[in-house]
Design a protein with these regions (language model features):
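Conserved, structured C-terminal
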Residues: 36-302
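Extended, compositionally biased flexible segments
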Residues: 1-43, 47-63
């Protein structure tokens, strides 16, 4: 069923491997994004963005010998340059720098067996820990992780920090930066569409779809773009901002620019009109905003 629903070939995945994968509507729009892990023979876990994906799967499960259930998991993120050292301590040495990007498995963390992947929502070196619903002693896990991280200066942070880092890193938010009215190509995610695989939902529409992107980055030295801000070309509105934040890394205001039509937008200086009516010069750039070779998240900058 996952080969039918997701845009990448799932049946050939190795155990412990993770893929970023999209689910599309029949018309080729982006319905859901997430990471699918192969837990074992015929066992998979799709870590989805917000939305009714389980209902979608159940509706499409007719004719498949499949069991679909929500594990009621909550995800903890250990992200940053010291994350390998922290997880090494938390796992009693079982997790180290040899664990590749987008690999996963079960590990003992303070006496609890939990699923861990070398992924994250920050485009930073890091790990995600998947709690097992009511079976996990969350308080004990929290105390164990904080004790492992204390010698490395680990701190608890909010989703605001996560949002800033994910936008800096070019990670899109489903229904915020992309939605069912956009194809993966328009969202700049064409690399995750395998048109060579057998039929999947949306494939026929995507074969004939325009391959040009409508989504880019925007930088502004004078202001921070916010959701709903307009992008003007010679006083004509040509796009809008889906999400924006101040970037500590770049020292600029940054945001995702969604254009109404394809065009040669990159490297163009345009006008950003904020909701308060003020207008500021801005530049359109390719995503991500930095580390375009993804060396940090792969640990290749160490």
């Amino acid at each position: 069923i996952l080969d039918k629903v997701l845009s990448r070939r799932i049946s050939t995945m190795e155990e412990g491997r993770g893929y970023y994968a999209l689910a599309c509507t029949p018309s080729g729009g982006v319905f859901m994004d997430g990471v699918v892990f192969k837990l074992g023979t015929n066992r998979f876990w799709y870590v989805q963005a917000d939305g009714p994906f389980e209902t979608w799967l159940l509706a499409l499960s007719i004719g498949f010998d499949v069991e679909i259930k929500d594990p009621k998991s909550r995800v903890l993120q250990i992200q940053g340059p010291a994350s390998i050292a922290i997880m090494n301590a938390a796992s009693g040495g079982a997790i180290d720098e040899t664990m590749p990007y987008f690999r996963s498995g079960y590990f003992d963390l303070g006496g609890q067996s939990l699923y861990v992947s070398r992924t994250g929502f920050t485009n930073e070196l890091g790990f995600e820990i998947y709690c097992d619903g009511g079976e996990t002693n969350h308080l004990a896990l929290w105390d164990h992780l904080m004790a492992a991280g204390e010698p490395h200066g680990m701190e608890f942070s909010s989703t605001r920090a996560l949002t800033i880092r994910r936008i800096e890193g070019g990670i899109l938010g489903n229904t915020t930066d992309m939605d069912a009215s956009m194809t993966p190509f328009e969202a700049g995610l064409g690399a995750f569409i395998d048109l060579e695989k057998e039929d999947f939902i949306g494939r026929d529409a995507l074969i004939d779809a325009d391959r040009r992107s409508l989504l880019f980055g925007l930088t502004c030295s004078a202001a921070t773009p916010s959701s709903g801000s307009e992008i003007l070309d010679d006083q004509v509105v040509v796009g809008h901002i889906t999400a924006g934040v101040p970037s500590p890394t770049l020292g600029l205001g940054i945001g995702y620019a969604r254009f109404a039509e394809p065009g040669d937008w990159v490297c163009r200086t345009m006008a950003l009109r904020l909701p308060d009516g003020s207008t500021h010069a801005c530049e359109i750039v390719d995503l991500p905003f930095f580390d375009k070779e993804h060396k940090i998240v792969r640990g290749l900058d160490r």
